[in-house]
């Protein structure tokens, strides 16, 4: 059994999703969004760190999975996204959680079956896979998708290696 915290980082809205993986079964534990209110980036980064720390304290995950930075058309946006990811990752590392990263296309492939899926498709499939009564918010659905991707990737690694791979574990320690 493993509790997985998935993060969809953003400098204004950071989605989170928590699931429990027990064999092939995935159970929804919680999800939502950390919405930053500060005008300046350093204040928003502090809010992201505090929010992720609070979620870790509440759910006590075993694993932290986060979406990788993609190349944005706007370099400033990509830098801010990278800094938001950093705030979330530091919260995970401070809690001694192993950190795993997944590309957006891989996450969409794991959840929807195609790397080019849109947010609505991800929301629909996350709702279906976790048997949720309603579609989660877009950023929360993306974060749940990160957690589902990790669960599916971990199952594949276990099947291939006979045990969980630690190749990416502790990357930020």
Swiss-Prot record:
GO terms for cellular component: cytoplasm; Holliday junction resolvase complex. Its EC number is 3.1.21.10. Its cofactor is Mg(2+). GO terms for biological process: DNA recombination; DNA repair. InterPro entries: RNaseH-like_sf, RNaseH_sf, X-over_junc_endoDNase_Mg_BS, X-over_junc_endoDNase_RuvC. Keywords: Cytoplasm, DNA damage, DNA recombination, DNA repair, DNA-binding, Endonuclease, Hydrolase, Magnesium, Metal-binding, Nuclease. The active site is at 8, 67, 139. It holds the Pfam family RuvC. The keyword Electron transport does not apply. It is found in: Cytoplasm. Disulfide bonds: none annotated. Its main location: cytoplasm. Belongs to the RuvC family. The RuvA-RuvB-RuvC complex processes Holliday junction (HJ) DNA during genetic recombination and DNA repair. Endonuclease that resolves HJ intermediates. Cleaves cruciform DNA by making single-stranded nicks across the HJ at symmetrical positions within the homologous arms, yielding a 5'-phosphate and a 3'-hydroxyl group; requires a central core of homology in the junction. The consensus cleavage sequence is 5'-(A/T)TT(C/G)-3'. Cleavage occurs on the 3'-side of the TT dinucleotide at the point of strand exchange. This is Crossover junction endodeoxyribonuclease RuvC. The lineage of its organism: Bacteria, Pseudomonadati, Pseudomonadota, Gammaproteobacteria, Vibrionales. The gene is ruvC.
């Amino acid at each position: 059994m493993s509790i997985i915290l998935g993060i969809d980082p953003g400098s204004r809205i950071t989605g989170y999703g928590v699931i429990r993986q027990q064999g092939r079964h995935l159970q929804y534990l919680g999800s939502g969004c950390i919405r930053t209110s500060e005008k300046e980036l350093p204040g928003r980064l502090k809010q992201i760190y505090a929010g992720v720390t609070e979620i870790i304290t509440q759910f006590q995950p075993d694993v932290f999975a986060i979406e990788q930075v993609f190349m944005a058309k706007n370099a400033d946006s990509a830098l801010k996204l990278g800094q938001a990811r950093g705030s979330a990752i530091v919260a995970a590392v401070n809690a001694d959680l192993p950190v795993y990263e997944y590309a957006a296309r891989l996450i969409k492939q794991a959840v929807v079956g195609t790397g080019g899926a849109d947010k609505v498709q991800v929301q629909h499939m996350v709702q279906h896979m976790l048997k949720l009564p309603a579609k989660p918010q877009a950023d929360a659905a993306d974060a749940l998708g990160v957690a589902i991707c990790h669960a599916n990737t971990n199952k594949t690694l276990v099947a291939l290696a006979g045990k969980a791979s630690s190749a990416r574990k502790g990357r930020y320690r």
